[in-house]
Amino acid sequence: MEILLIVLGAVVAGLLCPVQTAAEATITLTGSDIPTSISIHHGTRTPTSSGELSQSTFSSSSTNSSDSFYTTTSASYTLLVGSHTTSTVTANETTLSGNATATETSREPQPTNTRPCNGYAEFCARSYGNITQVAAHNSPFVRPGNIASNQELDVVTQLNDGIRMLQFQTHLVNGTIYLCHSSCDLLNAGTLESYLKKVADWLRDNPYDVVSLLIGNGDFVGVKNFTAPIQSSGLIDHVYTPKNHSIALDDWPTLSEVILSGKRAMVFMDYEANHGEVPYILDEFTYIWETPFSPTDRNFPCDIQRPPGLNEADARKRMYMANHNLNLEISIAGATILVPNTVLLNETNAVSGFGSMGAMAGNCTEKWNRPPNFLLVDYYNIGNVNGSVFQVAAKLNNVTYNGKCCGRTTSLASESVLGRLSGKLEMIYSMIVINILVMTIL
């Protein structure tokens, strides 16, 4: 089992001078809250107390070595590694099989993990491709009363609550990338740069978290149009660049490895990504496939829709996203458009029951023999119980959700009359805009 030990507190250059052997290597890290270097050593012996730990990071994975190198110090430390367990859990009669992988039991007692990765200590030793994460559909589109809105809480609150993938749609307007839903006349959430700056700031304040971003390239513009906002926002300091342009499901690094690298922002784009031009913007469909997009069917079939033509054998080698944002078809001026079905949110985002996230997750897990990697939702903070979408993800990950987020138990449609009236004017405006857009198309 791999063990990664991280020292907490300030690390002053020159204070640590461990003797290196041929089996060791030094890695330079970035970030104010993690050490400036780590030593990696392969051996069989694992330290069982803080007195046996050096102010360096060790990885113990080889079963052939007869000894190990650990210097003695009483400095405080954090163990960045998660336990591996396999279990089947039940969410209100919905059976969910988890992501954890069983490993051989160690002969010696293991230290207890004290530092969570993405909120859970168990995630640290798991592959990025072996974790289920909740994704905010159209994360920036927070506009009370606007028919095109998909979330109620801002991006910083989303991240604080536990959202670990941010999905959004972009449009190029006069040389600037904006966050707009279908049309910038319908809902304009500002520039991509401004949004990414908030994400970059959050990453700096949370050095043990990995965040994924999924860019919807609404205008199919060239990938280089996205480099300026990524660089100017400061997100460039955190973006992950893979060693090659195709990583199989089982080949993703562990969360602790990603965290130690300092590159904790995984950036994907649905169309026009080009590894040769911009290697840190990953082509979504090379790594991830999706279930039906903009679903209106409450059964939420777990079939491959994007990329089209992907065969089952290749799909099993990739991560996958379950689109669980229920939509409603409405007709305006003879045209049909899709809007979020807010009336059924407390059922759609529920732990169990027909049309629930729990039921969908169980169906997908049974069909593909593994849970979805990403659960895409509207209004993540609404469900049948507090943090219901996070409860479903936790059960899929074989961990216990103890968060205290969000979690209203009523749908938007059942709010007070006063609450609904507060957004009435903007709703009327958005409907007028939709009418104009439809008439323009016709």
Curated annotation (Swiss-Prot):
Disulfide bonds: none annotated. Residues 1-23 form the signal peptide. Residues 36-67, 91-115 are annotated as: Disordered. InterPro entries: PI-PLC_domain, PLC-like_Pdiesterase_TIM-brl. Glycans are attached at N64, N92, N99, N130, N174, N225, N244, N346, N363, N386, N398. One of its GO terms (cellular component) is extracellular region. Keywords: Glycoprotein, Secreted, Signal. One of its GO terms (biological process) is lipid metabolic process. SUPFAM superfamilies: PLC-like phosphodiesterases. Gene3D superfamilies: Phosphatidylinositol (PI) phosphodiesterase. GO terms for molecular function: phosphoric diester hydrolase activity. It is found in: Secreted. Residues 48-67 have a biased composition (Low complexity). PANTHER family: PLC-LIKE PHOSPHODIESTERASE (PTHR13593:SF140), PTHR13593. This is Uncharacterized secreted protein ARB_08043. It comes from Arthroderma benhamiae (strain ATCC MYA-4681 / CBS 112371).
